[in-house]
């Protein structure tokens, strides 16, 4: 039975996130007058985003066309695929489609943010067919580090638009992690119009090390440990957590988790049967001291840098629950991103100083949850797409993936390297990239959504780098005189007691500026404040080569 609904006229593919970056996945596919959102993820802030908690895609384009949106389709349950859903649903109404575990994690996110909105959830699997006016949508099982991951297939009259989600190929994994290569091959034979595919490891040659080999290595490493064992692991890597549980059970060690980020997702997945946990294996963290050190494993978990931060606090004897002791062994079951390498190196030194032994990783093992070069080429060769769109990676990774596609037979002119907001448009004859829609980042700080922009970040950088300089003056405008002050206050700029001459010079300059302003025919407070900013900034820079944030405060009596 054909899954094509009707002859289509117009197709648009628009990345709003997940290109030029490893996170924040969001891809819009429009077929005629229907719009479909593929993933809705978040990103954790970069170092320069001071005070920002998370980053989500700007969905202004979707809001402007919300009547066309038929649903949010989710590939898997990681935050960079589902983390923005609760924020989006506060702004628009849309049904949400995903696997059983993925939707359970979305609902938990909604609950944790106290988003009380009635949402239509549709649980899908590899057998599901979702029927719409212009297209049908089906799904296929993929392998990732979290169970129930899906690829998404939009059937059009030109062929299928396939979104792989984040994937790798590993035949050693079974059950909830087994890739459905047979169904992928069927989709390829039916005809793939465009393949939107994960580029994260496009620069890594070969294949990933099979997970059964990795588990064997973990066992060999743990079996040599005589004392307490601490494992650093991402809360999102369910495969690695299961392997640590398996190994601990074989070695007759109890397991305890250290890290709040894991608690909700782990408990949800555990209740739903996605973890295989022997009876009495787990113990509360406050009971670890009741067991001999050679009979426990502590898994320090979290998102992004949280596991490393926990280890650092433990090494410095500052952790609220547990600290490193002489004779502890530490195993890092995480892959270091570029911006984490220095932090990890510093933490390892702290751990060694505190008396811990760092279990070395086998350099021959490459344990990623994303496909390496040969796995990416395998997906391309299975799907045989007419057009290819590399996503989910930094731009250099997208370029590397584009090269793999070309080597696999996709013509260069049919490979599209896109940035956020680019519109790939097919009108029935030609596929072109000649439009752009509104796109970018929405920064979330606490409960504020989108109220932190470039100007706020600039101010935070100024405060962090050069401090703040405040000049307070009280005026008597009726008599055109200074009633009190100027009073100078400074934080993070200079040590006031050692800079009394500079403070006096600044005070005199403020007085001079204010008195000049008071002599004007019409007193303009804004002009006086701006003159204070400009002239004080110049004075301070000439003396210190620093540019603190200058805040004039003028009050009246």
UniProtKB/Swiss-Prot annotation:
Any one of the GO BP annotations: rRNA processing
PANTHER family linked to this entry: RIBONUCLEASE J, RIBONUCLEASE J 2
Species this chain originates from: Staphylococcus haemolyticus (strain JCSC1435)
Subunit structure comment from the entry: Homodimer, may be a subunit of the RNA degradosome.
GO MF annotation terms: 5'-3' RNA exonuclease activity; RNA binding; RNA endonuclease activity; zinc ion binding
Compartments it resides in: Cytoplasm
This protein's name: Ribonuclease J 2
GO CC term, one of those recorded: cytoplasm
Binding-site list for Zn(2+): 76, 78, 144, 166
Cofactor note text: Binds up to 2 Zn(2+) ions per subunit. It is not clear if Zn(2+) or Mg(2+) is physiologically important.
EC identifiers of the protein: 3.1.-.-
Residues annotated for substrate binding in this entry: 366-370
Record flagged with keyword Manganese: no
Similarity comment: family membership: Belongs to the metallo-beta-lactamase superfamily. RNA-metabolizing metallo-beta-lactamase-like family. Bacterial RNase J subfamily.
């Amino acid at each position: 039975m054909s899954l094509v609904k009707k002859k289509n006229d117009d197709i648009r593919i628009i990345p709003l996130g997940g290109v030029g970056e490893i996170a924040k996945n969001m891809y819009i596919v429009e077929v005629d007058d229907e719009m479909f959102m593929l993933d809705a993820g978040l990103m954790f802030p970069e170092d320069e985003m001071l005070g920002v908690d998370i980053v989500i895609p700007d969905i202004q384009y979707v809001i402007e066309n919300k009547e066309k949106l038929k649903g949010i389709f989710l590939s898997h349950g990681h935050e960079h695929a589902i983390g923005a859903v609760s924020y989006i649903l506060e702004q628009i109404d849309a049904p949400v489609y995903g696997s059983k575990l993925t939707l359970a994690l979305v609902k938990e996110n909604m609950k944790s943010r106290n988003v009380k909105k009635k949402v239509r959830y549709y649980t899908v699997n590899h057998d599901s067919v979702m029927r719409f006016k212009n297209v049908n949508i089906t799904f296929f099982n993929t392998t990732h580090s979290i169970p129930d991951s899906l690829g998404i297939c939009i059937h059009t009259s030109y062929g299928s638009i396939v979104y792989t989600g984040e994937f790798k190929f590993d035949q050693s994994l079974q059950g909830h992690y087994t890739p459905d290569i047979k169904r992928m091959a069927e989709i390829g034979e039916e005809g793939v119009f465009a393949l939107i595919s994960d580029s994260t490891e496009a620069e890594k040659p070969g294949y990933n090390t099979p997970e059964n080999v990795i588990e064997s290595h973990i066992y060999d490493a743990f079996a040599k440990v005589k004392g307490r064992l601490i494992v650093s692991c991402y809360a999102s890597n369910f495969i690695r957590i299961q392997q640590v549980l398996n190994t601990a059970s074989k070695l007759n060690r109890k397991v305890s988790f250290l890290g709040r980020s894991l608690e909700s997702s782990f408990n949800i997945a555990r209740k739903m049967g996605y973890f295989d946990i022997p009876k009495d294996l787990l113990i509360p963290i406050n009971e670890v001291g009741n067991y001999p050190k050679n009979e426990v494993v502590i898994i320090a978990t979290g998102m992004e840098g949280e596991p490393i931060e926990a280890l650092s606090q433990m090494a410095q004897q500052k952790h609220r629950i547990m600290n490193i002791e002489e004779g502890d062994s530490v195993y890092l079951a995480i892959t270091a991103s570029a911006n984490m390498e220095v932090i990890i190196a510093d933490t390892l030194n702290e751990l060694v100083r505190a008396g811990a032994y760092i279990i070395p990783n086998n350099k021959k093992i490459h344990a990623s949850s994303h496909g390496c070069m040969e796995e990416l080429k395998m997906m391309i060769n299975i799907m045989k797409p007419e057009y290819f769109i590399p996503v989910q990676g930094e731009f250099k990774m997208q370029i590397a993936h584009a090269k793999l596609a070309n080597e696999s037979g996709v013509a260069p002119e049919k490979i599209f390297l896109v940035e956020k907001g680019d519109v790939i448009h097919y009108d029935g004859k030609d596929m072109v990239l000649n439009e752009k829609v509104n796109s970018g980042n929405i920064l979330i700080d606490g409960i504020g959504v989108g109220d932190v922009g470039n100007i706020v970040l600039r101010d935070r950088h100024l405060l962090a780098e050069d401090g703040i300089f405040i000049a307070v003056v009280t005026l008597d405008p009726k008599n055109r005189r200074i009633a009190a002050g100027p009073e100078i206050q400074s934080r993070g700029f200079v040590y006031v007691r050692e800079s009394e001459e500079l403070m006096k010079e600044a005070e005199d300059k403020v007085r001079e500026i204010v008195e000049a302003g008071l002599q004007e025919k019409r007193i303009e407070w804004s002009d006086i404040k701006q003159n204070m900013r400009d002239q004080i900034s110049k004075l301070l820079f000439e003396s210190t080569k620093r540019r603190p944030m200058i805040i004039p405060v003028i009050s009246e009596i």
